[in-house]
């Protein structure tokens, strides 16, 4: 459950399992705080991480027929959508918009090399950067005590805060992006 920046609507996921032989299916919906004006935003069996860009638009890693799995920017209460980061964001991640709405940051789950990747992307001109690779000990891979990066912006848009176990224990780290974001 995530409220829009103006508090007028919220996102929620509806997850179900048709039978025990298949995986979970997920769709994303929005509604007013009183539960009225429900709108199905994405209904093609898979939605993962999501964030409000502004009171009307939602970025989500989801599936669309004929396209596949991508980050899509959906306009709430409409059928409008656009792909964000085509060819750059290739896997699901914890996505977040900068306070000014100009930049998207996302992480990845660790690969076989036990490295999380942290990416920054500006849709306006397709500027994109890998900000770093962060080690996660193999013994926590896929376990409840794993540590995803979960990037979050400082209010001034000059730094990102991430969770990481790159030093051997779970810590918070600041990543200075001011030279990129202005």
Name each model-derived stretch.
Residues 1-11, 38-61, 88-107, 137-155:
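Conserved beta-propeller blade repeats
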Residues 13-41, 56-58, 63-83, 109-136, ...:
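Beta-propeller blade-edge and WD-like acidic-aromatic loop motif
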